[in-house]
Amino acid sequence: MSTPIALVESLDQEGRGVAHVEGKTIFIDGALPGEQVTYKVRRRKERYEVADVLDVLQASHLRTQPGCEHFGVCGGCAIQHLEFSGQVAAKQRMLESNLWHIGKTRSERMLPPIYGPAWGYRHKARLRVRHVAKKGGVLVGFNEKSSSFVADMDSCRVLPPHVSNLIVPMKELVGQLSIRDRLPQIEVAVGELATVLVLRILEPLQPQDAAPIKAFADRYGVEVWTQSKGPDTVQPFYPLQGPGLSYSLPEFNLTYPFKPTEFTQVNPYINRVMLRRAMQLLQPQPGERIADFFCGLGNFTLPIARSGASVFGMEGSAALVARANESAALNSLAGQVEFQEADLFKMTPALLQSLGRFDKWLIDPPRDGAIELVKALPDIEDADADTSHVPQRIVYVSCNPATLARDAGILVHTKGYRLLASGVINMFPHTSHVESIALFEKASP
């Protein structure tokens, strides 16, 4: 039986090449658009197959040598073999394709893509840990590609260099602990004044574990925390009084303290540029009342408030609402912002109307999108609907182009908005993750 050959047409949202052979869709790991490849099928379904590339018979001009020796085994990155500008262009095409095929809409203009450093950008990560005696001890890293096994790695180029350099010492540290078999994860969080490692422990540390942990923290200048159960069990182990984590937005004269397990943007360089773009699109003005839905710890809320607008933030996490209030007070903005805990996936038209009138919205939902929120807006076909609370402008920041496209379709086709602009934000270089931003404006009657 001859080895099958395919001509790759596009990339899917997992960074795999997409081809069609004899009426069947083939998803090929390691293949790029425009390439002719041979492949080996590893999973067969009735309508599609998943395969690995064997040989590249005709290579794309955008194919490049991966920058990390672990690429192809480690599952942390999916498209290091695609030249950096090609990654951004592929993500732009994914966004446009989703908007059209899912939302049945197109953006009136495409925004220039936002991108920054290709390496060392990832300031938060969850590293898997496994004690495997036959592999020489402890593994610390991301999962292997398409596997639940931990990749055997000694560095990671998307992590900041000082964190990458800790991978081998972390292996050695875990190997010295009494609970090396009961420590499945180390969560890394990098702030401007500190780096924190959170040890996820399934059993309590023993007294003899303190000495190696303290020696490690002192030698490498990090804080070591522990987490025994849920997020509320996260606490410092050593030192007990460190400088703590924070990030700043100098353009807006803002500083945000945060806990290592609280949600913050993984890429602080792109976060600053993304905020500038969001403010340019939102155009907040003094005296306006603006809603920030899924506001988290106030990453967008406080820059909006700096403009002189009054901002109302809603967030599902009580801990993040508390953190947002703390940051507002720290930055002398408590008088301009109000935060409320609410499950935005249970939004209703009545609840939305009860919040009062907003001139503008900013939405930054998780991967599930904001469907209940946008559905709560009055339909254009409902002539009797009260539209006094409807925002004239919506800026939507998305981490999933499929749910953005779905929500965009609702806003455009049933809620009376125009999709004025959209563009990609390369928050996660070398991965297939697509972050994007879109601007909607209420259409004239």
Curated annotation (Swiss-Prot):
GO biological process: rRNA base methylation
Keyword Cell cycle among record annotations: no
Binding site for [4Fe-4S] cluster: C68, C74, C77, C156
EC number assigned by the record: 2.1.1.190
InterPro entries: 23S_rRNA_MeTrfase_RlmD, MeTrfase_TrmA_CS, NA-bd_OB-fold, SAM-dependent_MTases_sf, TRAM_dom, U5_MeTrfase_fam
Reactions it catalyzes: uridine(1939) in 23S rRNA + S-adenosyl-L-methionine = 5-methyluridine(1939) in 23S rRNA + S-adenosyl-L-homocysteine + H(+)
Family, similarity comment: Belongs to the class I-like SAM-binding methyltransferase superfamily. RNA M5U methyltransferase family. RlmD subfamily.
NCBIfam families, per database record: PRK13168.1, rumA
Protein name, as recorded: 23S rRNA (uracil(1939)-C(5))-methyltransferase RlmD
Gene from which this protein is expressed: rlmD
